[in-house]
Amino acid sequence: MAERKYFGTDGVRGKVGSYPITPDFVLKLGWAAGKVLATQGTGKVLIGKDTRISGYMLESALEAGLAAAGLSAAFTGPMPTPAIAYLTRTFRSEAGIVISASHNPFYDNGIKFFSAQGTKLPDDVEEAIEAMLEQPMDCVESAKLGRASRINDAAGRYIEFCKSTFPAHLSLDKYKIVVDCANGATYHIAPNVMRELGAEVIEIGTQPDGMNINENCGATDIKALQNKVLETKADIGLAYDGDGDRLIMVDHFGNKVDGDQILFIIAREALRSGNLKGGVVGTLMSNMSLELALKQLGIPFVRANVGDRYVLEKMQEYNWILGGENSGHIIIADKNTTGDGVIASLAVLAAMVQHKLSLNELASAVKLFPQVLINVRFAGGANPLESDAVKAVATEVEKQLAGKGRILLRKSGTEPLIRVMVECEDAELAQLSAEKIAEAVRSN
């Protein structure tokens, strides 16, 4: 794979107004993508965004670039990332574009692309777009310029799609649900989905103003959700991130239920109903208790690198349909082609209704092991993880933890840092083990 200049693991991302998230660059990105994608046929590209104020500027720039390349843009307005994956498929579009920086603050933004199949663009297509960006920009003749249109019923279409994944014979009419939409793209989706399935819904984080996305709310900050669940005596709390591809839950006691526990609940339910195809993909950061709980059920488990892109790649490699991260990206591949917070929450709610069990009862099978994380800074040069002394200490700790825990040592890709992670049933042993390894790293 060629070295990337602009595309990271999740498209092009950065601070608004700083290269490359500038109007002129994004216009050219729209043009370059249009030139590469225009070979497909339908001539239309879907553009969705989250609720950041910069989304207006960036969608206009993309539209101009696409039009110059001869492609038409169809705008959905604020829409979750997984909704764009779904709508791109149903509209038979050349591609889908999402303007979002996910869980980042409002002053960041990004551009990511979906293929006509609703999956991330293949590497060779991203590389072709990067190569096109190096060419001088031109414009098709006037008669071939693209147009712009708006899909007025995009939200309704996606709401119906989400509801179609919930068993028709079940209802949420006995449930009180607090929904936190992070003042992001699910603000007009998730509350309506839950209400239309019968739930009593209490909303927080559903008043976007362009600048309050992810601010003290959503999947990355659940304190307000926990308080509201307890205050209103709700059955469950749901927290999405700014673009709706992550889910974190809160039980009726106010306890956090993370992505590992959510993944287990969905996997066990799929196994019971005979819909689990193969096993489950987690990441290097997935809690060991998830692995052990799945093992007890006879469900295979493999770890991918951190990042939903890598989870999906591993799922495709094994031809499995379920994967996710502890951060709350949950991919149910027979329902959508990317992580989908709303659909993941419906899968858990269906299990609650079906078995008349609380979220707390469903999640109790995965008692998360304490994780201790220590970041150790080192002087540039040799990688301390290659030192014999560090390897010896790591091996000794692994023997002590045998079967009861695990260690993960990683060098940061962006800073001179070694990340030491120790996970163990015994919190004190985890802390002592992590400090022992960190000390060995510092001494080398």
From Swiss-Prot:
Gene for this chain: glmM
PTM remark: Activated by phosphorylation.
UniProt keyword list: Isomerase, Magnesium, Metal-binding, Phosphoprotein
Residues of the active site: S102
Protein name: Phosphoglucosamine mutase
Taxonomic lineage: Bacteria, Pseudomonadati, Pseudomonadota, Gammaproteobacteria, Pasteurellales
GO biological process: carbohydrate metabolic process; peptidoglycan biosynthetic process; UDP-N-acetylglucosamine biosynthetic process
Organism: Histophilus somni (strain 129Pt) (Haemophilus somnus)
Family: Belongs to the phosphohexose mutase family.
Record CDD domains: GlmM
Domain of life: Bacteria
UniProt catalytic activity: alpha-D-glucosamine 1-phosphate = D-glucosamine 6-phosphate
Functional description taken from the UniProt entry: Catalyzes the conversion of glucosamine-6-phosphate to glucosamine-1-phosphate.
Record PTM Phosphoserine, positions in chain: S102
GO cellular component assignments: cytosol
CC cofactor note: Binds 1 Mg(2+) ion per subunit.
